[in-house]
Amino acid sequence: MTQYFEIENRDGAARIGKLLLFPEIRTPCALHTAALGDLENPGPIVDAGSLWIADQKELEARIKEIREKTGKGTLIILPHQTYPPAVPAESTGKVEAFTATGDENAEAEGPTGSLLRAEGEVRKSDLYIMEGAGTLENNARRFLETLIDLKNRIPPDTALYAPKLALPENAAMLAYVGIDVMDDTRAEIAAYSDIYLTAAGSFYLDSLVEFPCRCRVCAATTPAELRALPKADRVELLSAHNRDALDAELALVREKIRTGNLREYVEGQCRVRPWLTALLRLGDFEYSYIEEKVPAFRQSQLLADTSEALSRIEVVRFARRIQERYAPPDLDVLLLLPCAARKPYSTSQSHQKFILALGKYRKFVHEVIITSPLGIVPRELELTYPAAHYDTAVTGHWDEEEKAWVSGCLESYLSKHMYKAVVAHVEGAYREICERVAEKLGIDVVYTAGESLASYESLTNLKNTVEAICTSKDFSRKSQNAEKEKKNFIKAVAGYQFGEGAGHLFSEEVGDPLVKGRFPKYQLFAGKKQLATLIPQYGMLALSPEGAELVLKSEKYVVKIDDFVPRGSILAPGVLDAGPEIRPNDEVIVLGKKALCVGRAMMSGREMKESGRGVAVDVRHVKKL
């Protein structure tokens, strides 16, 4: 925990924060490396020096001098002795000896930064520096392993600094995986080598005909004019451009974090260098590290335009919850349908035609939509994020990765849930997927589509096929009326959202709950008590205190506080415990000795327990106990 860093916005592992120094520093940011060593005119962050070039006593005196001059408004990076990551930990004892004698006094007087190596001891600090970060460029696996090791061991509300690594081309990816602070070392070095930096990559100055930038340097000169300048003047101007390009990229990254679509940006930006693409893909494989930080829903649309969208956390989480938490209605006929451009699907023109064709037999049918990248979407979850909030490039062509992923989702579902009859009103790749799964599982699927899904012939065939199944002698005629359909809708959303805790909303204790309202503005009642409301914007439930008391029995999505009655948002220091399953934007139940509250989580459960600053829960209702 630190009192000098406050997180303001989150987008997965990326975040916008403030280093509470003088002046404040907004992160993610790039420090001016040359200014870190300016002891005469120290800025908000000062490097006390290296143990390679000065002894311990000299550096301790330097720390004291800096602190007396700047007060607590300056963060002092404690003396360090940097080693390449390959050097064994037992060979780095000298830096341990320094922090053991100098750390306590420095910490008591003001903010400090400490060097941290993989698997090394974590000491209390306000900024952690990733040792040897610059040597890990082009080694995505080693970089990510080191980063995750450090992130899992330091407090979640503390900033992490990766020195000597940032360029305009990789700054977005570094922020995406969780780096808060960078520097302009590489930008300065590039200038001395006549290298011109952009977010789209680097260029040698002698290869440029015109500048693809309109910064203060580029707008005032041309590549030919810059090449004609003396070396010192050329370096000065090129360095200014490179630093501006890095700062501009980080400003864009901060905006992407605010709007919640940094992922879409890095899916394109990572193409600049192969190691960045590898870093994105490896990050998706580290599901638990990233998933903990990804919100339950976003305000922005999810754009699935690349192959990496199939492994995106929101997509994988949705698919997993379908398999692990979703319970379909008790019906014997499954109807597989293709997705639609308009969301939710049931409002699209094509799905309206399917529904009209089913007519009175729709109540016997369970509808599941096949789609990429989400895999399958039961009709009851078509409103739930991200099912109604994604868009993808539609070409009519599915690559093998898409087919394999969606086939796997459908196969897992049909292996777990049995139907007496399966009808598929699909064509093209959708039909190929159904045929693959049917052959593998040994089930019969009836296909009803002709040349066009929405043609009169196809719709008539769909109607007649379903009618024939539902009127056959051996058909059990399990069905759901309008009221039961609405109840199944709410039950599915609750199960997706709360897991096993959702069952308490429909337990015998509640009796026979009633769903009121028209789609999508459903409300769940037990008698005259409102238990929950479906929020159409993201397709999840907002609990009332009465509903919270029921879900509370599962002991999931619970935040525990001390004996006080909240009067607004609950801050992280006020949290005693929080469920590890809690993600940002989750609906949570706050329980204390004097109050029961419901609200929205503003950070993960782990962050709530381990953070010293920031809003943990945005409280909506408070019930005094």
From Swiss-Prot:
It holds the Pfam family TGT_C2. Its EC number is 4.3.3.-. One of its GO terms (biological process) is tRNA wobble guanine modification. The keyword Signal does not apply. Disulfide bonds: none annotated. GO terms for cellular component: cytoplasm. Residues 556-624 form the PUA domain. Pathway: tRNA modification; archaeosine-tRNA biosynthesis. GO terms for molecular function: lyase activity; RNA binding. InterPro entries: Archaeosine_synthase_1, ArchSynthase1/Queuine_TRR, DUF5591, PUA, PUA-like_sf, PUA_sf, TGT-like_sf, TGT_C2. SUPFAM superfamilies: Pre-PUA domain (SSF88802), PUA domain-like (SSF88697), tRNA-guanine transglycosylase (SSF51713), Uracil-DNA glycosylase-like (SSF52141). SMART domains: PUA (SM00359). It catalyses: 7-cyano-7-carbaguanosine(15) in tRNA + L-lysine = 7-N-[(5S)-5-amino-5-carboxypentyl]formamidino-7-deazaguanosine(15) in tRNA. CDD domains: PUA_archaeosine_TGT. Keywords: Lyase, tRNA processing. Functions in the biosynthesis of archaeosine, a modified nucleoside present in the dihydrouridine loop (D-loop) of archaeal tRNAs. Catalyzes the addition of L-lysine to the cyano group of 7-cyano-7-deazaguanine (preQ0)-modified tRNAs at position 15, to generate q0kN15-tRNA, a q0N lysine adduct identified as 7-N-[(5S)-5-amino-5-carboxypentyl]formamidino-7-deazaguanosine. Forms a robust complex with the archaeosine synthase beta subunit RaSEA. Formation of this complex highly increases lysine transfer activity. The complex likely consists of an alpha(2)beta(2) heterotetrameric structure. Belongs to the archaeosine synthase type 1 family. This is Archaeosine synthase subunit alpha.
